């Protein structure tokens, strides 16, 4: 048997939602791929149609390159995030610089992702959504992030959160509110709202968040995607618990 073609259910669900929502509410998410000339438009469609495992399979088969996928994600972020405001810090250069060092046998092969701005990524600003931490740059990544990168994920930036993750809406004085991609007048939920909005808008196929009392699940339900609270001891232990 050949490799299974992984096309995520959530993409089908979101496309169905798009047909029932007004164009003004969807703007600027709706039509971004068709508005981009080929080959960028083609890569944008692949970014939307495949989940992380499916994109990794395309990269492994040399149908596309990891750099092309990462650049397509960067293009989409540049096009949409002024309105959605999902990211607090971009790490595009860091991701592109690390791509050549991604081992060829990793699970994710350089697939792009994002990390909630509540977790240490070495050399990248971590603010906790607070003006108090705008100058905080950790020297070392937590074990969870190291495991993500060993698995071949390319981190493109940090995602917005309410200050110190203390709320079910993503809004703070430092960066402002994160809008729901399906209706920009509504909030993405919280506290992992930046990550949920980024996935729903098609920036990346998956993003990291934290969840103690619904912080992944609430924004996921607001944005129409899957959000998980991992069981204890089923992931790398440490701060990301």
What are the residue ranges of the model-derived segments?
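Generic low-polarity alpha-helical segments
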Residues: 10-13, 72, 95, 236, ...
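Gly/Ser-rich catalytic/binding loops embedded in alpha/beta enzyme cores
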Residues: 17, 21-22, 38-213
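Small/flexible residues
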Residues: 9-12, 78, 118, 219, ...
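Fold-level recognition of mixed alpha/beta catalytic cores in primary-metabolism enzymes, strongest
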Residues: 168, 196-241
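Boundary at the C-terminal end of the N-terminal hydrophobic targeting segment
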Residues: 33-37
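N-terminal secretory signal peptides and thylakoid transit peptides that target proteins
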Residues: 2-21
């Amino acid at each position: 048997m050949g490799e299974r073609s992984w096309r995520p259910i959530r993409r089908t669900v979101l496309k169905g939602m798009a047909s029932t929502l007004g164009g003004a509410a969807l703007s600027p998410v709706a039509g971004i791929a068709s508005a981009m000339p080929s080959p960028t438009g083609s890569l944008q469609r692949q970014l939307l149609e495949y989940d992380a495992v499916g994109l990794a399979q395309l990269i492994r088969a040399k149908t596309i390159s990891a750099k092309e996928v990462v650049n397509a994600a960067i293009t989409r972020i540049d096009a949409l995030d002024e309105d959605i405001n999902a990211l607090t810090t971009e790490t595009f250069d860091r991701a592109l610089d690390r791509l050549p060092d991604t081992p060829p046998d990793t699970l994710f092969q350089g697939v792009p992702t994002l990390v909630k701005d509540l977790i240490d990524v070495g050399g990248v600003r971590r603010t906790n959504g607070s003006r108090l931490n705008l100058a905080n740059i950790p020297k070392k990544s937590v074990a969870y992030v190291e495991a993500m990168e060993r698995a071949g994920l390319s981190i493109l930036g940090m995602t917005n959160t309410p200050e110190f993750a203390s709320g079910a809406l993503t809004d703070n004085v430092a960066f402002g509110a994160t809008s729901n991609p399906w209706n920009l007048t509504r909030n993405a939920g919280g506290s992992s709202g930046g990550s949920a909005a980024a996935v729903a808008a098609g920036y990346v196929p998956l993003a990291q968040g934290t969840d103690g009392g619904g912080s992944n699940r609430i924004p996921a339900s607001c944005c129409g995607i899957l959000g998980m609270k991992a069981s204890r001891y089923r992931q790398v232990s440490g701060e990301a618990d």
